[in-house]
Every structure is written in structure tokens, then in C-alpha cells.
Amino acid sequence: MKAVYIIGTDTDVGKTLICAGLCWALKEKGYNIGYFKPVLSGAKRRGKMLIPQDTEFVVNFAKIKGDIYRLTPFIFEKPASPHIAASDENVDINVNQIKQTFEDLSQNYEFVIIEGCGGLAVPLKEERNQFYMQYQLIKEICNNVILVTTTKLGTINHTLLTVEFAKAYGLCLKGIIVNMYKNEPDEDKVINTITKFTNIPILAKVDFINDFPSDVDENKFKNVFKKCFDDRAIRKIMGVFEC
């Protein structure tokens, strides 16, 4: 089994959409793909049930087999940093449980895409005034990272800071996916600037989908992913799994 951890430069850069697209595109190419999101905050209620909506979307869109509550073992309603949401609900985010769940899931797939909760420096838990951070979990279960960014104002700073943080803490950041791409003149200038500073390959540029997540038109999504995750992009992405 091989895996890659999808992380973002910021909240709302579209990690879930990218994970769904990657899972779907790779399955279309015949790869046995699994999905895992260890921690999710900001879950929505449906009746009495708390739904990990990111996981539900990826599983339904990419037709991945698995119980959403197993694929996301820690779910919190409060839209906050996991260590705060967990503390408010008196829940211990058990890292060993996450590791074991990942190991169990890995037995069923050739490749697993792991979706992070926010960015690298997100605290997952606090115990005796000590923080356990997302980058620590990444290093322990899959030190193989793809960074999702955008071209919006401020993204150069966010992206470069994330890359430098990854280097400082020994993370294997293998590529960048640019999401919400609109093919506007300055966007490629932003992307070129990021590439010159980081020397990290751009794996794909994914077109902006203006009605996500309010209106899930699967055919529209699939057309975008067919274009953006073409054979060339897929070859680059599969190379990332080779850690």
C-alpha cells in the first residue's frame, strides 16, 4: 500500500474537492484507491446524526466503499481547530486509534489518499500543556505530502510559509495542486513565482467550480477532473506515491 497526505495552505482552499477528484480520476484509470480523513471539525447535523460531510461527498462522488464513520473516526460539530472542538466535547483524539484505523484500511487498497484537517500547523490535541500537531501525525503515518493552494491574493505568502514549515519539520512535500484556477493573466504569474521560490512541481491546475459545494453536478465535476487530471497530470501524481 502507498499513500499521500493532502494538506492545504489555508481553510477553504478545496482539499475535499481535490481529494474527490483525485480518487475519481485514479479509479477511472483502474487504480484501487481508498480515502481516509482522520479528523473533521464543522460537521453538519442531519436529524440526530452528525455527518462528516467531506467524507460523505468524497465517498459518494468517487464511489469508494467504506463506512464514513470508519473513514473519519473523529468528528466534531464545532467549526474550530480540532484540539478546541475535541476539548469542548470532552473527546480525546486518540492518535493510536487513528494509526490503527489507517493500517486496517490500508489492507484493502493499493493506494490511499489521506485528507488533512486544515494546514500543517493545526493542533490536533492538547495534553498537559503539550500540543500534538498535524505535521506530527503526517510524519508518523505517511510522510508524503501534496499541498493544495489557490491563486487568490495572499497565496504566495501562505504557500511559501507552508513549504518552509514543511522543510523545517522534515516533511516530504512532493508537489503542489493549484485549485480554483480561472485562467486569468496574473494567475500564471503567481504560480511561476511559487515555483521559482520553492522548486516544487505543480502537479495540476484545477479549474474553478463556482457552485461547489452548494450544487453538486457530478457531470460538471467529472468534466473538470477529466481535463485537469489528464494523463500527464496522473503520471506526475502517481510519482508522488513513490516515496
Swiss-Prot record:
Compartments, record wording: Cytoplasm
Cofactor(s) the record lists: Mg(2+)
Residues where Mg(2+) binds: 16, 54, 115
Top EC class of this enzyme: ligase
Ligand binding (ATP): 12-17, 54, 115-118, 179-180
Alphabetized InterPro entries for the sequence: DTB_synth_BioD (IPR004472), P-loop_NTPase (IPR027417)
Residues bound to substrate: 41
Source organism superkingdom: Bacteria
Matching CDD domains: DTBS (cd03109)
Pfam families attached to this UniProt entry: AAA_26 (PF13500)
Example of a GO MF term: dethiobiotin synthase activity
Pathway connected to this protein: Cofactor biosynthesis; biotin biosynthesis; biotin from 7,8-diaminononanoate: step 1/2
Annotated catalytic residues: 37
Alphabetical GO biological process terms: biotin biosynthetic process
EC number: 6.3.3.3
GO cellular component: cytosol
Keyword annotations of the record: ATP-binding, Biotin biosynthesis, Cytoplasm, Ligase, Magnesium, Metal-binding, Nucleotide-binding
Catalyzed reactions per annotation: (7R,8S)-7,8-diammoniononanoate + CO2 + ATP = (4R,5S)-dethiobiotin + ADP + phosphate + 3 H(+)
Subunit structure: Homodimer.
Function: Catalyzes a mechanistically unusual reaction, the ATP-dependent insertion of CO2 between the N7 and N8 nitrogen atoms of 7,8-diaminopelargonic acid (DAPA, also called 7,8-diammoniononanoate) to form a ureido ring.
PANTHER family, sorted: DETHIOBIOTIN SYNTHETASE (PTHR43210:SF5)
Family: Belongs to the dethiobiotin synthetase family.
Name used for this protein in its record: ATP-dependent dethiobiotin synthetase BioD
High-level lineage: Bacteria, Bacillati, Bacillota, Bacillota incertae sedis, Caldicellulosiruptorales
